[in-house]
Design a protein with these regions (language model features):
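Phosphate-backbone binding interfaces of nucleic-acid-interacting proteins
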Residues: 1-106
């Protein structure tokens, strides 16, 4: 089955206790039921700067437990390898806030 890409709005984002990397997102995916996705991107973003953003998620992955929390999907990001360095930078894919939650990407 094909991946289902949807616009999602970040309602809440918090650092997962006892985890250096994980952020827990509470997302509006247009269904009327909040969706939880965990993402190991705390090195790149502080949770509060992501609230209110419109992101892209793959929403038809089976739930996966991380630190005891069900993560229901995956957020899309772009990774750039920094020149002359082992480091990479990660950017969550953010889209125009006019795009409604749940809009399907083709």
């Amino acid at each position: 089955s094909k991946s289902d890409f949807r616009a999602v709005k970040v309602k809440e984002c918090v650092a997962v206790p006892k985890s250096k990397k994980l952020l827990q997102f509470t997302l509006d995916d247009g269904t009327g039921t909040d969706r939880t996705i965990l993402s190991g991107i705390h090195a790149y973003y502080e949770p509060e700067e992501l609230v209110g953003k419109t992101l892209i998620a793959i929403t038809n992955f089976p739930p996966r437990k991380m630190m005891g929390i069900d993560s229901c999907g995956m957020l899309l990001s772009a990774v750039n390898n920094l020149k002359d360095s082992e480091d990479e930078e990660l950017h969550l894919l953010m889209v125009d806030n006019h795009i409604p939650a749940g809009a399907k990407l083709y």
